[in-house]
Amino acid sequence: MGAQDRPQCHFDIEINREPVGRIMFQLFSDICPKTCKNFLCLCSGEKGLGKTTGKKLCYKGSTFHRVVKNFMIQGGDFSEGNGKGGESIYGGYFKDENFILKHDRAFLLSMANRGKHTNGSQFFITTKPAPHLDGVHVVFGLVISGFEVIEQIENLKTDAASRPYADVRVIDCGVLATKLTKDVFEKKRKKPTCSEGSDSSSRSSSSSESSSESEVERETIRRRRHKRRPKVRHAKKRRKEMSSSEEPRRKRTVSPEGYSERSDVNEKRSVDSNTKREKPVVRPEEIPPVPENRFLLRRDMPAITVEPEQNIPDVAPVVSDQKPSVSKSGRKIKGRGTIRYHTPPRSRSHSESKDDDSSETPPHWKEEMQRLRAYRPPSGEKWSKGDKLSDPCSSRWDERSLSQRSRSWSYNGYYSDLSTARHSDGHHKKHRKEKKFKHKKKAKKQKHCRRHRQTKKRRIVMPDLEPSRSPTHRMKSSCVRERRSRASSSSSHHSSKRDWSKSDQDDGSASTHSSRDSYRSKSHSRSDSRGSSRSRAVSKSSSRSLNRSKSRSSSRSGPRRTSISPKKPAQLSENKPVKTEPLRPSVPQNGNVLVQPVAAENIPVIPLSDSPPPSRWKPGQKPWKPSYERIQEMKAKTTHLLPVQSTYSLTNIKATVSSSSYHKREKPSESDGSAYSKYSDRSSGSSGRSGSKSSRSRSSSRSYTRSRSRSLPTSRSLSRSPSSRSHSPNKYSDGSQHSRSSSYTSVSSDDGRRAMFRSNRKKSVTSHKRHRSNSEKTLHSKYVRGREKSSRHRKYSESRSSLDYSSDSDQSHVQVYSAPEKEKQGKVEALNDKQGKGREEGKPKPEWECPRSKKRTPKDHSRDDSVSKGKNCAGSKWDSESNSEQDVTKSRKSDPRRGSEKEEGEASSDSESEVGQSHIKAKPPAKPPTSTFLPGSDGAWKSRRPQSSASESESSCSNLGNIRGEPQKQKHSKDDLKGDHTKRAREKSKAKKDKKHKAPKRKQAFHWQPPLEFGDDEEEEMNGKQVTQDPKEKRHVSEKCEAVKDGIPNVEKTCDEGSSPSKPKKGTLEQDPLAEGGHDPSSCPAPLKVEDNTASSPPSAQHLEEHGPGGGEDVLQTDDNMEICTPDRTSPAKGEVVSPLANHRLDSPEVNIIPEQDECMAHPRAGGEQESSMSESKTLGESGVKQDSSTSVTSPVETSGKKEGAEKSQMNLTDKWKPLQGVGNLSVSTATTSSALDVKALSTVPEVKPQGLRIEIKSKNKVRPGSLFDEVRKTARLNRRPRNQESSSDDQTPSRDGDSQSRSPHRSRSKSETKSRHRTRSVSYSHSRSRSRSSTSSYRSRSYSRSRSRDWYSRGRTRSRSSSYGSFHSHRTSSRSRSRSSSYDLHSRSRSYTYDSYYSRSRSRSRSQRSDSYHRGRSYNRRSRSGRSYGSDSESDRSYSHHRSPSESSRYS
């Protein structure tokens, strides 16, 4: 028939419900009558229902399910819509009519097939000549108009399977009447004759062939329909083969007629090319048998060559389809797969097709697919880079293909952040489902990595995996950081937060991250976080150190800080070892730290792969060193510092001396107060690492400040895990001195201070973490009380410091809990800040606490509904503080995590808002959260609130800091803040487990220095050591309890010892200089605090012991808390509560919460640590980062095993801390522990350096592609950009895991506070709060907070934060903040002197907020760089919002 006689039909196409035009086809009914008739009838729909499919034989409503750019667009599957269905009007398949026409030009209509003689209803329109399809696919028509529609379809984005994301549908189709009449009739006649002859012959001949083949093919099709992928793949091959055969046919035919026809068509095309290119309708009859190999063979590209040979392709494709056909994801395709055409032979011909599995996939897709595949391992490891950590590890990448690359950021997601890290799991699943192939592969890989992390994480995060990871995870999550969506509450929240950070930011996410983050990411702004965080962490560390020192002794801190701070700011700013150098010992160590920061920043990415993931390392494993020369450097420096640490360890007394030298102003205070401050800082650093989150959360105004300073180092540590952690750990672990050095680098001043504090307060640190919890709580209660009193203001500041720690701890905890709810927490914190401010303004503790509880509960609801109950209890506790004591204790049991959360959330938020508000109003609302948190918070509060509040808080912190300070110093040597936190967290976990074996593990506490390093080791060590440490830790806890008990009697002794009760004395002595008129009352409240066990570490132990029978485990845990969490951090009451809850957590999704409750027990320090640890573990799976945190993190992660390991670690930590049981014991223990610690520190120093390094290594080495750390790191990296501080938090998260509590919350906040680290402005604001606390601890917290902030600012945010100062309560804060930021020396001192509570907190907040805004801009840049800017920024905003004020809170919300 003439070209004009040929029938024409049309398709009206719509893309995503929008009509795009009409494609007109001309069918070569003269050449392929049967195929043309099939197509025409399918266009007209006149044939009724198909025999095979039972669907109406009509193209109307069918889709173009396969689009290969520069090749073809395929459609016609009216039954399945995915290339696996469709049938001809003849029933099933019909034979290839002929291959006269060739695929020699574009816009030919050819039949898709699954092999020889498998033509059904599927057709394709070539968009380029496809000679490889000649002899495989039957060309039966061409497009005469609608070319632009075809091109539009061809240019649609498609997935890996070449399936367009858009819905390309034939909304109407039909046959043109004129030709329809003629051609259709002719075709019908011809087709009946030809087609039916063909059909009958097709059916007769093919009856056997086609019948068997058709039936087989039908069955195959049915199978394929069932197994669409396999079928699709096969279908592709067939189609390709069909196309190939059709092309040859068509070419042949087109030669005669085709060319004239083509000229016509070309004319039409030129005319229509602008209009519509109609798909040539492929008649099933005309569709030649497709060489199956070509079309079907994904692996067997030879089929393409078999253009004319249809038989071979038929046979081969089927076989090869089944054998070789592998989906791009590597899945074997069963059946022949969907009908597909081979991609053009050029570059994508059979060979490429083989490679691609479906050559039809455009090269860019292939590349992307390969990239994704290649990335999959990294996706576990490098989530922070491409995706939000929070988003599920696989989810991220997987969703990245699904454009969920920003898996909220979702492996974090981790997550939002919440879902990122933890979403990482949730999203993993979702995304996996979405991207079954990629997701399965990636999800499996990523999820595996992630699960490895999330094994840790999931215990923590599993509940939170709901959101995630993780994500970040996050997040991860786990985003992070960290575990924003983790264990039911803590885990979930932590994981969620992290995931938020990671996913939401971080997911997020979350990282995480959750957190995601965590894990948020806790896991994304890690690199940036590392860079920024590292710089910030260093700055912060220095600031923290300085701040702590300053806080500790405004005067001493100031000058010391001044020298350190300025240097540190510079150093921190530069983030260079050189900066480190300016700080004397600090400098070298700082150099280490800085190097570590750099290493951390750099190392986290590279070294992680160097050796087995740190989590896999044994405690003494060395890959760290090869991985990190900087680790070695840090080791060398740490070794320098180790002696210092040894000195510190050996001499908590020396630490006092060092404190004197380092913080002479605060010497008495320094020993305990400084130790407390340091410890606070450490605790805050540990907790502050956690507090980096915390700090970053700035929710714990002081704690977070301190925590933050430390946390920043931790952040830095996490950022450059070893560095930061080494910073912190080196700060804390490498003998206080190394700590100091590290701290000098990151928290040089902080380090020195902390080192001293640690040396004084290794136990103090341990204590302090506890004590930070306790002290925080004590300070909180003191703070509340003291605040209410005239010394209340000072105490408030001091309490603030403690509270900050507590807040930090709480916040960290909260953050950990809030990992999923990081944002929630940030909001809650922002609300709390508002409420805290309002309450502080209104001074309604209960109210504040209630809102805090409420807010916190919202966060914690996600995190811990049980904790929410606990929170409500905690809120009630807070509200009824007298009842609160027992209630809190009980609540703590039920609400350990909630208490912790509350403490952290409230303390954190309270601290944030309270510090800001304390500083602003110096009201007890922030404190009440802490004190109210304390079981004996009321009793302690009453005692404490007058003087005890500050005094004991500080004393408690100091004592606990001493208790922990020395062990922690030793621990510091080991893991310092990070290690401390991790250890504390672990110790808490272990405290739970090891409360029974407290005493023995003291040496192991030493041993935990390497475990610091054993970020990796920690997990394994945790598992192995946990058992060992558990007894030791329990014994230590018992010892500590005894020490606490003794410390209560021997307040002085315990003071030195680091016991809360003695710490109140010593704290009173030491922290009285810090201006806490409540130190002696602190001593009183210390016992009260013992009542308030949560409030005060020794009191914690006492309290637990008081509640011993009922709280036996609580006592154990509180003991552990006392030991691990003696610092107010845990607020042992909380610890008590934590015990059950911690255990509960351990068991439940609150595994994260368990660590948090363990952390709650050691909450400020260990609790946050643990939570951070959990987060960290989740986020980073950062045992190293969580070495202490690992205990926490690991505990949550490996709820039992890891917790045991964590507790072992913590046992070790506790053991380290434990030596500081009494001042005498502290000295002796310190000496012994120092010696042991020295030995261990020295032996471990390399590891201590590596501890930080290991932390980093844990951060890095430990990072497995799917590990939490990896997620956290990714989150950190991702967060690093978007939320440098958050990133730091995430990065810090591992480090901060050391600061388990703060860090954990900061993990929570590491996603949240990783955001909060970008909330570090928030943290800065919390710093302000910290400063507020430091105001009482006034100088100490606030000043050093200031300084720390300044240093922090100095580093990256010096301006940022400085701007922040100006920006937010820029009024005076601006001046001071700027002063602080501007004159690091001055503002170290200046800030120190400029310690007005409100100022400080304003300043901090200003810094925080401004930093939030500026750093949100700037850090945000970092953080944003991390890619979590939104989450981070949000977190920061939130953080600083709730830090800042209700308005800011609102803003955050």
Curated annotation (Swiss-Prot):
Residues 187-625, 651-1453 are annotated as: Disordered. It is an enzyme of class 5 (isomerase). Residues 195-213, 532-546, 554-565, 682-726, 736-749, 799-809, 948-958, 1189-1199, 1322-1346, 1380-1401 have a biased composition (Low complexity). Residues 1303-1453 are annotated as: Arg/Ser tandem repeat-rich. GO terms for molecular function: peptidyl-prolyl cis-trans isomerase activity. Inhibited by cyclosporin A (CsA). Keywords: Cell membrane, Isomerase, Isopeptide bond, Membrane, Phosphoprotein, Repeat, Rotamase, Ubl conjugation. Residues 221-240, 329-348, 425-460, 755-772, 983-1005, 1369-1379, 1416-1426 have a biased composition (Basic residues). Its main location: membrane. Residues 403-421, 651-661, 1170-1180 have a biased composition (Polar residues). Residues 259-286, 382-402, 514-531, 773-789, 820-852, 859-868, 887-902, 966-982, 1030-1045 have a biased composition (Basic and acidic residues). GO terms for cellular component: plasma membrane. Its EC number is 5.2.1.8. PANTHER family: NK-TUMOR RECOGNITION PROTEIN (PTHR11071:SF257), PEPTIDYL-PROLYL CIS-TRANS ISOMERASE (PTHR11071). This is NK-tumor recognition protein. It comes from Mus musculus. The gene is Nktr.
